[in-house]
Amino acid sequence: MNLLLGVNIDHVATLRQARYALLPESPNAEPSPIDAAEDAKLGGADSITIHVRGDRRHMQEADAYRIKEATDLPINFEMGNTQEMIDIALKLKPKFICLVPETREEVTTEGGLDVVGLYNELAPTVKTLQKAGMIISMFVDPDIHQIEASAKIGAEMVELHTGCFANAVAEKVNSRNAELDRLRKAAVRGHDLGVQVNAGHGINYENVHELYEVPYLKELNIGHTIVARSVRVGFQQAVAEMRALMQGYNPNLGGVER
């Protein structure tokens, strides 16, 4: 079974905002997240991930509606648990919602959502969005308690935060095996609880193959590295290269197909 690839196009909007933050609607505003979504599909993406943050640092609300209208790929809408974002989600009606933590100080999402500690605040949001027909994912650290709380709250999916794993691989430190073990245990627990297990954050062309050691993964959500690679080879080719690196995964072995 091939892993599904969700392509996060937020940082296409980041590049646009670097020049057109005050004029995102200008005819000159580029690059276009809509073009990126179209190229992602041509490159083999299975879904498109977008995150409209409260501070609108990259994706704008208008982008979300236009992207959804322009592509027939399912939209995975990342959002903080705020009434503003709930209202946007109810208007946008994406196929998937991924609830994430969000602070203005962070450069990007730096850790998993504390479903255990925020259970009572998150539960009504999950219920509201599911009632409107959306499939819910929780972006969580690979922690057994967070997986169990996500299943208890009724989320159909979890996305395992792979940032610590990615840092350990890049820095060639001894914690690499420990981080993979955390991911393995979290994936097994999610599978046992009947929750779809996805993963994302910090995954790149150099480390993606190491996630073959983690069983029961369904989809990887990858963004920044694809946008960075696209500067050299174009967006469609960057997606296709990542797609090729994700072939041959065996979810039951947690390793390369044998």
Located regions from the model:
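Conserved N-terminal beta1-alpha1 strand-loop-helix module at the mouth
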Residues: 1-77, 88-94, 175-178
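Glycine-rich phosphate-binding active-site loops on the catalytic face of alpha/beta enzymes
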Residues: 98-106, 157-170, 216-235
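Glycine-enriched alpha-helix->loop->beta-strand junction motifs that scaffold or abut catalytic
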Residues: 44-46, 70-73, 91-97, 131, ...
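Hydrophobic faces of well-ordered beta-strands that scaffold small-molecule active sites
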Residues: 3-9, 48-50, 75-79, 97-99, ...
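C-terminal helical cap(s) of enzyme catalytic domains, especially alpha/beta-barrels
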Residues: 68, 170-176, 229-254
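Catalytic cores of alpha/beta
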Residues: 83-92, 143-153, 199, 203-217
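Histidine/lysine/aspartate-rich catalytic loop segments that bind and position anionic ligands
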Residues: 135-189, 193
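N-terminal active-site wall of soluble small-molecule enzyme domains
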Residues: 49-128, 145-146, 160-168, 183-189
